[in-house]
Regions:
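N-terminal leader/targeting segments and the immediate start of mature chains
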Residues: 1-52, 103-107, 159-167
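Extended lipid/amphipathic-ligand handling interfaces
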Residues: 31-32, 58-60, 150-152, 156
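A short glycine-rich beta-turn/N-cap micro-motif
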Residues: 39, 63-65, 131-136
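An acidic-aromatic
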Residues: 44-90, 145-147
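Short, ordered beta-strand-loop transition motifs
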Residues: 61-63, 98-109
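Hydrophobic alpha-helical segments, especially N-terminal targeting/anchoring helices
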Residues: 69, 101, 128-129
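A short, amphipathic edge element
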Residues: 87-100, 149
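Gly/Pro-enriched, hydrophobic low-complexity segments
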Residues: 107-166
C-alpha cells in the first residue's frame, strides 16, 4: 500500500514538531543573560566604528550601583542597582547554538542570537559558560562592531566616580 502525502503537509508537520526545539534554544541564552545581569560584574566594551577607530569603555555593576567609564576615561556613578535592571528579554527573538569555544580558559557554548531591544536590532554571538554566565558577546549595531567581555571575579567600583549629571 502506497500513501501519497503532499510535501507541504510534511513540511508543516516538521515545522510544528521542531518549533518547540528551536524556541528552546533561547531558554539557556535568556537564563544566562538574566543570571549575568543580576550578578555583580565588570565589563570591558570595545566599539570599532566603520572606519576602524576603536573606543574602549568600562562598566562596573555592583549590587547597589552601576559605574560607567566614558571614552575620555572619566567614571560616573549612575545610581542603578541590580534590582532596578530591566528583565524584559522579549526582544531576544531567535537563538541558535553554533558551537563551543573558551573564554579566558573557561569552556563556553556559543550562541548566535537575533535581538530587537527597544528598537535596536542586532545579530550577536554570546559565549555562555557552564556556570550559566555570559562571558563574552560580539555584535554589530548601526555599522559599529561591539565586543563585550564580562568579568565576575574582579568587581571593584572606581573611587573617583562622579554622580551622573554632576550632582
Amino acid at each position: 500500500m502506497h500513501i501519497n502525502i503532499p510535501r507541504s503537509l510534511i513540511a508543516l508537520a516538521f515545522a510544528v514538531l521542531t518549533a518547540p526545539t528551536l524556541a528552546d534554544e533561547c531558554a539557556p541564552v535568556k537564563s544566562a543573560m538574566l543570571n549575568s545581569g543580576h550578578t555583580p560584574h565588570t565589563v570591558i566594551l570595545t566599539q570599532t566604528d566603520g572606519q576602524g577607530k576603536k573606543t574602549v569603555t568600562r562598566q562596573v555593576q555592583t549590587v547597589d550601583n552601576k559605574y560607567v567609564q566614558t571614552a575620555d576615561g572619566k567614571w560616573y556613578a549612575m545610581n542603578i542597582a541590580i534590582k532596578d535592571l530591566d528583565d524584559d528579554l522579549s526582544g531576544v527573538l531567535t537563538c541558535r547554538r553554533s558551537g563551543s569555544d573558551s573564554v579566558s580558559g573557561e569552556a563556553t557554548v556559543v550562541y548566535e542570537v537575533h535581538v530587537n531591544l527597544q528598537g535596536q536590532v542586532s545579530d550577536q554571538k554570546l559565549w555562555v559558560s557552564s556556570k550559566n554566565m555570559v562571558l563574552k558577546s560580539e555584535g554589530t549595531i548601526e555599522g559599529s562592531n561591539y565586543t563585550t567581555e564580562y568579568d565576575f571575579a574582579h568587581v571593584t567600583p572606581p573611587a573617583n566616580a562622579k554622580p551622573m549629571g554632576g550632582k
